Amino acid sequence: MNIFDFFRDRKKGSTASVAKERLQIIVAHERGQRSTPDYLPALQKELVEVIRKYVNIESDQVQVALESQGSCSILELNITLPDR
C-alpha cells in the first residue's frame, strides 16, 4: 500500500457519471426554486384586459397565484370588484 493511496478517493467512478450526478442535483434544485412559471405575468395581464371589458378595475386589484399539490396545479384568481 502506497501512502498516496490513502488520500485517494476509494470510490472509482468516471468523471462523466460524477458530472451527470452533479448536474441532476443542480437541475432538481433549480426546479424546486422555481415557484412561479414564466407565463404567469402575461396570463395575469391578459386576464385583467378581459375583465376590464366588463368591469372597471385596476391592475393591482387582480391577484393570480399558482399552487402545486403533487401532480395537480391550482390557479387561484382573486379580483377585488368595485362597489356598484
From Swiss-Prot:
Keywords: Cell cycle, Cell division. It comes from the Bacteria. InterPro entries: MinE, MinE_sf. The keyword Cell cycle applies. GO terms for biological process: cell division; regulation of division septum assembly. Disulfide bonds: none annotated. The keyword Cell cycle applies. Prevents the cell division inhibition by proteins MinC and MinD at internal division sites while permitting inhibition at polar sites. This ensures cell division at the proper site by restricting the formation of a division septum at the midpoint of the long axis of the cell. Belongs to the MinE family. This is Cell division topological specificity factor. It comes from Pseudomonas syringae pv. syringae (strain B728a).
